[in-house]
Amino acid sequence: LKPALPGFPGLGRKLLNILKTPWEGPSWKTVPAGAFEDLFFIARPEKANEYIALVKEILTKYTYPHTQLGVYVQPIEHNRACQIEFTFFYDPENEAEKAEIAAIALEAGTELLKRGAQFTRPYGVMVPVIYDRAGNYTATLKRLKNIFDEKNILNPGTLCF
């Protein structure tokens, strides 16, 4: 960044510090329970209610209270699509709760995928599910990784392999 922005002398230096530390303390997402699992994807806006109902229905099979489910819907592309995000908050010290959240996210993500949700940035428990279904994509990622990192020293294990 430039040290000064037009009309705002010295803001460039201040802005860099603000961007590096947007808030003090832990992330707002860890405050409710200590940890969270996100399930996010792209969908058609008219499918949002169906997907929310599906996840709430899946929750009835588990002990996780649906009132603690975080739901975020962000219209994109002038509302031709939307990003939908489900956040499952849990106590990272409670192994049973952690395992239950992983099971919920995996079941919900798999069902959402079957119903047309587009997981364009696989994350968490959905990584193996998405990459297993996208063999050509995975093979292409491996070839690209090999071109730029022949010795596999940059972030080994962080892609789908």
Features from the language model and the residues they span:
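Conserved glycine-rich FAD pyrophosphate-binding loop
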Residues: 1-161
